[in-house]
Amino acid sequence: MNIIYILLDQVRKDMLGAYGHQIVKTPNIDRLAKDGVRFNNAFTPASVCGPARTSLFTGLMPSTHGIIRNGEKGGTGEVSEAAPNIGKLDGYNTYVVGKWHVGTKSVPEDYGIKGHNFDGYGYPGSGVYKNLVFNQPPTHSNRYKEWLDEKGYEIPEVSRAYFGDNPHLRVQELCGLLSGTKEQTIPYFIIDEAKSYISESLAENKPFFTWINFWGPHTPCIVPEPY
């Protein structure tokens, strides 16, 4: 059995068409909900990214895996390599693509998982969005930039930026227009990378677990035309 786990960031149940929202259009999610199984009584073990994602990664509650906040304050900071995690699926090729946010310094390779992570908003500290400032440096080389080069795309730039009024959340509250096409955006990059990993496993005739992580619709809202 192959597993593709797709995780979005900051999506409320009532914001989906399958649960009755009249404005937001989610046709593909609605189709999955109609043809698959809905877990109507599933609840996140934590209200912030780090602890919740670590619970998905390990199958443990935050009180057990030790990461209880975004960052090291009040917790262990990293997941013990002795803890259960998806990298220990026997006989599986395991991949992570996109946002990671498990621990504070660890990367997928620490747990025997292939892939690359870049946390934060967009590609923090990488210079891809040159007119934005991020505080968290990348933990991997800039694979997104390499992918853009491979595809013959220019590096997208942000224009018409509107920041929020909260001085501590100005970047998080940002809305802006991204140059280029939707095919140059990070979500397209994530899907393209995931397809490559899946094709690799199919060629090896091995089962795979691919964890695909998008930032959206978490702010900042940086989108190209026509959105």
Where are these regions (language model features)?
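A structural signal for well-ordered alpha-helical segments within the folded catalytic domains
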Residues: 1, 26-27, 51, 77-85, ...
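Beta-strand elements within well-structured catalytic alpha/beta cores of enzymes
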Residues: 1-12, 31-32, 56-58, 86-87, ...
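Active-site-proximal N-terminal segment of extracellular/periplasmic enzymes that hydrolyze or transfer
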Residues: 1-37, 46, 225
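Active-site-proximal cap/lid insertion segments
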Residues: 10-23, 132-227
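Short, solvent-exposed turn/loop segments enriched in Gly/Ser/Thr/Pro and often Arg
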Residues: 18-20, 36-57, 73, 96-107, ...
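Glycine-rich, phosphate-binding/catalytic loops in enzymes
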Residues: 20-25, 49, 74, 112-114, ...
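Catalytic-site neighborhoods of secreted/periplasmic enzymes
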Residues: 60-180
